[in-house]
Amino acid sequence: MKNLPIKIVSTGRYAPDNIMTNDDFSKILDTNDEWITTRTGIKRRHIAQGETAIDMAYKAALKAVENKNYDKEKIDLIIVASITSPVKTPSIANLIQAKLGLNHKNIVAFDINAACSGFVYAVEIAASMISSGNYKSALVIGSEHMSSILDWEDRSTAILFGDAAGAAIIEVSDNPKDNAYFWNGSRGDDTGILWIDPKVKMAGREVYKFAVDIMPKAIHKVLEKAGLTIDDIDYIIPHQANYRIIQSVAKDMNLPIERFLMNLEEYGNTSAASIPFLLDEHKTNNPEVKRVILVGFGGGFTWGAAILNV
């Protein structure tokens, strides 16, 4: 396998100010705080008002540029993972290029749709492209306006999701210890379990069964590819779907739950934004370089795991 030595130069995140609590849901649905919390671990979620996935992606990208005073003129690749763009074309990535004032540059910009696995997919694509030598700096974003595609009368799905965006700037590293490893995949025979038509639909029990099976498997597979053990990993950043799922994965792997970073109590499931958002949130408070596993799953089904130094 070709080595992919990359470094995360900077990260950024954005969530709308407007917060919807479980008690707020109890006023519009047959539910309550205890019911939601015990089943999901979610207490609050941020809901965009007058903003789209494009706006949130831009704000997260700008934070990533500003956090390290990064020279945005170096960026020559932009990849956005999202399932909630308000427009079919141009891509969110293309619009971020414009908002960053990079219109004069020869930049490759495109979106991908891999649902909640999207950011991990996008990082592997970016790593491969910059490692080819044809690109020098990749801006990778996960941005989701999930509230725009929810059925607000369906308590099984409406309570789960929030809006947010997370971004990372990636460059090639000259340190061989910065090799990145990936184990991504998909299957097409379960497309009727989690889908959007035109609102989010989900067979919750089947999604849970898939998630608790594929996430430990993905972690083990990516560790195997890297020639590492779980003891070589400082922490795991899982997709923030549901506390019970993460708890089950930790139990399956015989790991303390503290090894898994979480913020779903505050933000809920933000799909492709959840992993980069949590990555930036953690790095803000812990700037020292750590070796992490990113792991997620999503509609399709899709799944992805990555080992990175961040």
Curated annotation (Swiss-Prot):
Active site positions, chain numbering: C116, H239, N269
Enzyme class: transferase
Sample GO molecular function, one term: 3-oxoacyl-[acyl-carrier-protein] synthase activity
Catalytic activity: malonyl-[ACP] + acetyl-CoA + H(+) = 3-oxobutanoyl-[ACP] + CO2 + CoA
Bridged cysteine pairs (disulfide): none
Annotated source species: Acholeplasma laidlawii (strain PG-8A)
GO cellular component, as recorded: cytoplasm
Gene that encodes it: fabH
EC number, as in UniProt: 2.3.1.180
Main location: cytoplasm
Function description: Catalyzes the condensation reaction of fatty acid synthesis by the addition to an acyl acceptor of two carbons from malonyl-ACP. Catalyzes the first condensation reaction which initiates fatty acid synthesis and may therefore play a role in governing the total rate of fatty acid production. Possesses both acetoacetyl-ACP synthase and acetyl transacylase activities. Its substrate specificity determines the biosynthesis of branched-chain and/or straight-chain of fatty acids.
Keywords: Acyltransferase, Cytoplasm, Fatty acid biosynthesis, Fatty acid metabolism, Lipid biosynthesis, Lipid metabolism, Multifunctional enzyme, Transferase
Localization terms from the record: Cytoplasm
Quaternary structure note: Homodimer.
NCBIfam families, sorted: fabH (TIGR00747), PRK09352.1 (NF006829)
InterPro entries: ACP_syn_III_C, ACP_syn_III_N, FabH, Thiolase-like
Region feature ACP-binding, mapped onto this chain: 240-244
Entry protein name: Beta-ketoacyl-[acyl-carrier-protein] synthase III
